[in-house]
Amino acid sequence: MKRTLCAGVLLCVCCAASAQNARFTLLGTESVVQLDRVLTTGREHFLPPSERPKGYQWPRYQRAKYPVAVYRVDYRSVIPELHREPVEASGLLAVPLVPGARTLPVLSYQHGTVFGRYQVPSYAFSRSNPSGYPQYSGAFESRLMVAQYAGQGYVVIAADYFGLGDSDQPEAYTLKASEQQACIDLYRVAMAFLNKRGIGESRLFLAGWSQGGLVTTAFLEKLQTLGIRVTASFTAASPNDPFAAMNAWLYHPTPSDPLWENSIVALSLFSYQHYDARPGLVMSVIKPRYYAAFKRIYTRDYPNLVALNGLLVKIAHHPGGLLGYFRKRYQNSTYLADSPFGRLLAASETYQEIFHSPVRMYYGTKDEVIRVAVAKLAERYQIAMGSSSVKTMKVVDADHHGTFLAAAWDSLGWFNSFH
């Protein structure tokens, strides 16, 4: 009876509590039945069977053990690139209701690129959002990680990143320092919140998919600098070096390259222009006729995701693939390397730090976004520096989404082995 009461007290007390300038709003409690539904039927919306590559095997997730209390977290942070200008940020905290628990493992999950402002962790369990159109399905990755990990007894935290969710700034896309700051400040307020209620951290793990893989290794760098121990991390389909990834898309295109690569260019350029205070950067890189459409992509100025897809298709009708959006001087790959845009991309890399804890990097053999050579960059660099901390993990016949599903499943057993 006493053990069960502990979980109940946590729920009741946490609803309106705050810690270190943060507000924690209880969104509800996900039952094990609801969590299991995410792990089974939910994934078929994320990767429909009709789009699944031939030969890909569905992972078989473990059934959830515990119900999970889900909170939206609103907290204060600062923007390193803008001289530590204050910013309102948001994220998610998911606490498994483990009877009598005094310490729990913690997983910080970093989400991938989203095309709706509210397709983020803090809105992953909300059917409505301030945008006026549904974005619930686009936040499946965050629900899966909560179901897979919090359902097995891990506390899960996940930052939205600056400019997404309820944040009051434009999106800070692939801006290393800002993404590190968003993650570390959420970690601090979440741990203070739990500690105040008698729950400590037993071990810290990190994970991220796609853009979130890049953020994960950036966060790992930050934690190492601060002397905060990380037990282990995994990434899935991570562009460890944004410059190398962009170079491959521009100068070595393949038939399988996705249409939405143009949105990556838009998000990156406008983020760099705003946060690195480089007026005119966007116009110096892309042809003027694409400026308005790229700005709409960055600001999410479209009524729904169908309209976004229509916009992407409309501006894709030109020769030259992704490079066709760029000014003529960018036809030379050397120019990109020496340009402000190229240098900003290169500064976003997150694999040249020697990691002090093991990292698994999953890549799919049929990933339409991340080339195998890019996926293996971090491991090869670490080996060259005498480190064996990074290990790449091949997911046979997996595309970009399938790689994430497989990594989320396989990593649980690996993380559990450290307890």
Task: Please give the residue ranges for each predicted region.
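Alpha/beta-hydrolase active-site loop
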Residues: 173-195
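Short beta-strand/loop motif that positions the catalytic acidic residue
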Residues: 355, 360-367
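Catalytic-loop region of hydrolases
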Residues: 19-102
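Accessory cap/linker subdomain of secreted extracellular hydrolases
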Residues: 239-352
